[in-house]
């Protein structure tokens, strides 16, 4: 499979539905800093109330997410003074570490960060120290490979959601650290 410009691979609903049912973000808006066509925010809007607010940040004007969209390079934006309740992102693979690092740096005390990553992203000499400093609170493995091409075909990679939670609370206790979702096509 040839790489797409800006690593744009839309996230299928099956890859995110179980995650959104599990998460219980504090009240506030949901932000996807690599929104593409808005698939993750569409799924969040279907699971949560529209009054929350949904912000799509997208570098490529060819993609038109059906939400409030800020056309900008997330990695060069200054931090928001009002962090979201939930950062949810399928970042470009080549920039995944940079996206996650920035989301973690910009989260508020109650913000949840969820990034869809290749499972192989966990194993890397390059990221060894980074993972020790930024280990997620939970990993959700997608048992079925999702199709990011819209034709049902999958690549040969396994995928996971890496999740960092805000402060634990009665409404949002820390869940199991490792679990499996069906998640595929």
Task: Give the ranges of each region predicted by the language model.
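Class I S-adenosyl-L-methionine-dependent methyltransferase catalytic core
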Residues: 1-185
């Amino acid at each position: 499979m040839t790489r797409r410009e800006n690593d744009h691979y839309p996230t299928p609903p099956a890859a995110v539905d179980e995650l959104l049912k599990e998460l219980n973000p504090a009240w506030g808006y949901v932000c996807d800093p690599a929104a593409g066509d808005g698939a993750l925010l569409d799924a969040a809007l279907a699971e949560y109330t529209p009054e929350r607010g949904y912000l799509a940040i997208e570098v490529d004007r060819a993609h038109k997410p059906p939400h409030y969209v800020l056309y900008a390079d997330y990695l060069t934006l200054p931090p928001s003074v009002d962090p979201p309740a939930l950062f949810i992102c399928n970042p470009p693979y080549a920039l995944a570490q940079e996206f996650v690092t920035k989301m973690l740096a910009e989260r508020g005390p109650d913000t949840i960060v969820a990034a869809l990553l290749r499972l192989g992203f966990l194993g890397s000499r390059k990221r060894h120290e980074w993972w020790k400093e930024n280990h997620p609170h939970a990993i959700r493995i997608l048992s079925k490979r999702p199709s990011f091409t819209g034709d049902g075909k999958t690549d040969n990679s396994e995928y996971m959601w890496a999740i960092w939670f805000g402060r634990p609370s009665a409404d949002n206790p820390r869940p199991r650290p490792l679990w499996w979702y069906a998640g595929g096509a």
